């Protein structure tokens, strides 16, 4: 996508860049100021900047939603058995555990669980975490043989009260955050982008 963007004459890539402020212009479009001081006007400002969207905040679009009282623990892991380019999911009493295939033979895991268990799993060393994950997944792909950096984030449902304003559109997690079960957040984000 980035390479295709570089090829388009009407696209100017500003990368890396971070948004400082944005405001609607009287003549239409949005004026944007970056943290490095650069400013420009755009006919369409797309907020694709995640659940804590700065674009949504600057556009003064409120959200509604609730907490699932769970955390998602995420990491990339390597398993003893090949994933066969198949996504796997196991439903545990505390929430689903998903193994999503990556192109290099690793899996991306999303382990939805209680905040307490997520914190306990994060506190484990790599060996003990790999053992806990292997057991939770019932050795379906053999032993977990390598664990990348781990992180966790709280799970919540969140919807922007508006997805569009004149000259502005919110897509992906900036517009709507859903439980990671079955990867619907990714699917919704891709549909948002295709709709634009």
Model-inferred region functions:
Residues 1-58, 65-71:
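Conserved N-terminal helical subregion
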Residues 27-29, 83, 189:
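Pyridoxal 5′-phosphate
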Residues 27-31, 149-158:
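Short gly/ser/thr-rich secondary-structure transition/capping motifs
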Residues 52-87, 97, 103-107, 113-117, ...:
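Central beta-strand plus flanking loop segment that forms part of the substrate or channel wall
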Residues 153-196:
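Conserved mid-domain beta->alpha element of the FAD-binding
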């Amino acid at each position: 996508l980035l390479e295709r963007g570089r090829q388009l004459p009407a696209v100017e890539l500003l990368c890396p860049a971070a948004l400082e402020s944005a405001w609607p212009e009287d003549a239409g479009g949005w004026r944007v100021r970056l943290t490095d001081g650069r400013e420009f006007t755009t006919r369409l400002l797309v907020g694709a900047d995640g659940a804590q969207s700065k674009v949504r905040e600057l556009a003064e679009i409120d959200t509604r939603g609730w907490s699932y009282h769970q955390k998602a623990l995420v990491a990339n892991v390597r398993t003893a058995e090949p994933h066969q380019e198949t996504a796997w999911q196991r439903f545990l009493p505390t929430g689903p555990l998903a193994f999503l295939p990556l192109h290099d033979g690793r899996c991306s895991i999303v382990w939805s669980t209680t905040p307490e268990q997520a914190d306990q799993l994060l506190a484990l060393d790599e060996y003990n975490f790999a053992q806990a994950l292997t057991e939770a997944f019932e050795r379906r792909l053999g032993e977990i043989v390598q664990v990348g950096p781990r992180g966790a984030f709280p799970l919540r449902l969140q919807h922007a009260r508006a997805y569009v304003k004149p000259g502005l559109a919110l897509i992906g997690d900036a517009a709507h955050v859903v439980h990671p079960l079955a990867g619907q957040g990714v699917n919704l984000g891709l549909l948002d982008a295709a709709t634009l």
